[in-house]
C-alpha cells in the first residue's frame, strides 16, 4: 500500500523504502469507449440506485475534465470560477474551465465538506488515503455493473475515462502537444507511448482499409 501511495502522489518518493527496487510493470491492455457509449451512459436513469449514479457521475466528471485521475477528483476542492488543482502524481498545476456539464455535476453534489464529491470524510478516524483507496475499489466495482447495464464488453473503471478522453481527443485531430497538456503529462513522449498502447482500433481500421485490394 505504501508503494501505491507513492504512485498516487500521496507520499513523497524519498520516503519510499522500495525506491531502489526495480520491478518491470506488467503491461495491461488499455481500453476506451466511444462518445456514443458515453452519451448512453449519461442518459441512464440511475436515481433509484444512488451508488451506481455516483460511480457513473464520477466517470463522466473525469471525461469532461480532460481525463482527470480519480485520486485528483476525490481530493478536488470547490471553486466557483474554474477547476484549479495540482496533480497528485506529478505536482503539475492544471486549470480547467467550467463547462455546463462540469458545473451540473458539481452542483448536483452540493455536500457539507470542502470537497466536490461526497467521498472523503475529514471527521472520520480513518485516514484520508484509506478512504480514497476504499472508494476507488467501490467505484470501480459499481462501474462494472454500469457497463453491464450498457451491454458493453469493456470493463469500466475510472481509468477508462482517462483513456477515453485521450482517444477521442486524438480522433478529433487534436495535436499531441494539446493532448499531453490536457492529461497533465510532463512530456509529449509520455503521451505518445500512452496513446500507442491502447489505440488498437485505429490500427485495425487502417489495416482493414489497406486489405481491400
PLM ranges: what are they?
Residues 1-16, 68:
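N-terminal DNA-binding recognition helix of tyrosine site-specific recombinases/integrases
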Residues 20, 75-108:
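Conserved tyrosine-mediated DNA breakage-rejoining catalytic core shared by Y-recombinases
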Residues 24-54:
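Long, amphipathic, Lys/Arg-enriched alpha-helical "connector/arm" segment
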Residues 32, 87-91, 183-208:
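Catalytic-site neighborhood detector that most strongly recognizes the C-terminal catalytic loop/helix
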Residues 43, 47-50, 140-181:
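Short, basic (Lys/Arg/His-rich) helix/loop patches that form interaction surfaces
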Residues 78-82, 152-154, 174-193:
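Short, polar N-cap/turn motifs at the start of nucleic acid-interacting alpha helices
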Amino acid at each position: 500500500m505504501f508503494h501505491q501511495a507513492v504512485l498516487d502522489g500521496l507520499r513523497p518518493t524519498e520516503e519510499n523504502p522500495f525506491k531502489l527496487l526495480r520491478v518491470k510493470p506488467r503491461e495491461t491492455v488499455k481500453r476506451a469507449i466511444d462518445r456514443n457509449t458515453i452519451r448512453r451512459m449519461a442518459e441512464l436513469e440511475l436515481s433509484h440506485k444512488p451508488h451506481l449514479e455516483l460511480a457513473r457521475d464520477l466517470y463522466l466528471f473525469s471525461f469532461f475534465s480532460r481525463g482527470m485521475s480519480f485520486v485528483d477528483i476525490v481530493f478536488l476542492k470547490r471553486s466557483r470560477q474554474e477547476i484549479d488543482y495540482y496533480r497528485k502524481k506529478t505536482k503539475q498545476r492544471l486549470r480547467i474551465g467550467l463547462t455546463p456539464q462540469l458545473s451540473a455535476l458539481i452542483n448536483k453534489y452540493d455536500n457539507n465538506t470542502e470537497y466536490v464529491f461526497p467521498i472523503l470524510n475529514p471527521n472520520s478516524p480513518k485516514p484520508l488515503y484509506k478512504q480514497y483507496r476504499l472508494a476507488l475499489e467501490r467505484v470501480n466495482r459499481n462501474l462494472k455493473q454500469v457497463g453491464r447495464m450498457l451491454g458493453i464488453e469493456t470493463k469500466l473503471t475510472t481509468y477508462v475515462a482517462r483513456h477515453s478522453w485521450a482517444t477521442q481527443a486524438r480522433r478529433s485531430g487534436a495535436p499531441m502537444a494539446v493532448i499531453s497538456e490536457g492529461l497533465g503529462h510532463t512530456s509529449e513522449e509520455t503521451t505518445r507511448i500512452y496513446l500507442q498502447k491502447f489505440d488498437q482500433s485505429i490500427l485495425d481500421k487502417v489495416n482493414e482499409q489497406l486489405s481491400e485490394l
